[in-house]
A protein has these predicted regions:
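Non-transmembrane, aqueous-exposed alpha-helical and coiled segments at domain scale
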Residues: 1-171, 180-329
Length: 329
């Protein structure tokens, strides 16, 4: 499997005309998540690193979450040109002994190799090229995911944010709203005691924001850090813009402070994308980053209140509507 990563990196760097250690190279991959014929694929990451010089520690190699039964693929993006190369492994080739695999050509080792420019400014001016990439699934259905992450990384997206988008498996305005909500809560209800305090999220309603909060706060459902509930259309109308309830909980004192927050995606008059539909959210991903330090532009406080153990149980338990428990609906 290491040889697969090495071959992918070597081939891509030749095609993109990049040298080992080039600071403009980003690598995204499903390796480490994909399992092929019972074989885990994390060793491919070592091959990528050895050949390219990229690493997780340098913030230029990321694993994009995919279910284990999906193919293993590699994506190489050159920030300086916008050019990108997608390579999907040929599953049958991975069954070969190492020496036989080493003898394979690029076309034998990979079932799909596709090159395209995914820089958003290039796509704005060359929509026909974008139509080919997105409409014809140039990256086997991963176009939106890979283009979005690449463009924000290229414009200085923070490591933790990129990592969270990879957990969500793509970048979209919904994930960005999670970053803004997190920053807002952290400013209003800062963690003052790291041994006793943590954040809990009542994700009601749920959307992409909640995956970022799981990563940033370690607020996972399995550890009772997040409780996810949908709202009906009528309930959403009753509390317009409701994003959820966010609690700074002190597990020693068994009490906390809570914010019921609203999020308005249309609160700011952002620059608009005027091209084909595939570019709209990509463009929003980029322009929203200008507000990374101004999350309050999109957020409103619906209610601020105290929480004790009994109320926390009611907010979390099935059969109890958290917005009614909080008194906001």
């Amino acid at each position: 499997m290491q040889e697969l990563g090495s071959l992918a990196a070597k081939s891509a760097m030749q095609d993109l005309e990049l040298e080992k250690g080039d600071a403009d190279l980003l690598i995204l991959t499903s390796a480490g998540h994909a399992i092929v014929d019972g074989q885990t694929t994390q060793a491919a990451i070592k091959g990528l690193s050895v050949e390219s010089g990229n690493s997780i520690g340098d913030g230029n190699l990321f694993q994009v979450l995919r279910p284990h039964w999906k193919p293993v693929w590699f994506f190489f993006f050159d920030r300086s040109t916008g050019q990108a190369l997608y390579m999907q492994a040929e599953s049958q080739s991975l069954k070969k002994p190492v020496e036989e695999f080493k003898a394979l050509s690029q076309d034998e080792a990979f079932s799909k190799i596709s090159k395209a420019n995914v820089d958003i400014e290039y796509l704005r001016n060359h929509t026909d090229d974008g139509n080919i990439t997105f409409d014809q699934k140039g990256f086997n259905g991963n176009e939106f995911s890979l283009a979005g992450i690449s463009n924000v990384w290229a414009r200085g997206g923070a490591f933790d944010f990129i990592q969270a988008t990879c957990f969500h498996d793509h970048l979209c305005p919904g994930v960005t709203s999670g970053l803004f909500l997190a920053k807002y809560v952290e400013e209003k209800l800062p963690i003052n005691n790291i041994s006793a305090e943590s954040y809990k999220a009542i994700a009601c309603p749920n959307w992409c924001k909640d995956d970022l909060l799981q990563m940033r706060w370690d607020a996972t459902p399995g550890k009772s850090g997040m409780f996810v509930m949908a709202l009906t259309d009528a309930e959403k109308k009753a509390v317009p813009g409701i994003a959820g309830i966010y609690i700074r909980w002190n597990d020693t004192a068994k009490e906390g402070d809570a914010l019921a927050l609203g999020y308005n995606f249309s609160a700011v008059d952002l620059p608009q994308w005027t091209g084909p539909a595939w570019g709209s959210k990509l463009y929003q991903d980029i322009v929203l980053m200008d507000y990374a330090d101004k999350p309050e532009a999109f957020i409103s406080v619906i209610k601020e209140f105290k929480v004790d153990a009994a109320m926390l149980a009611q907010l979390q338990n099935a059969g109890m509507h958290p917005l009614k428990v909080a008194g906001v609906m």
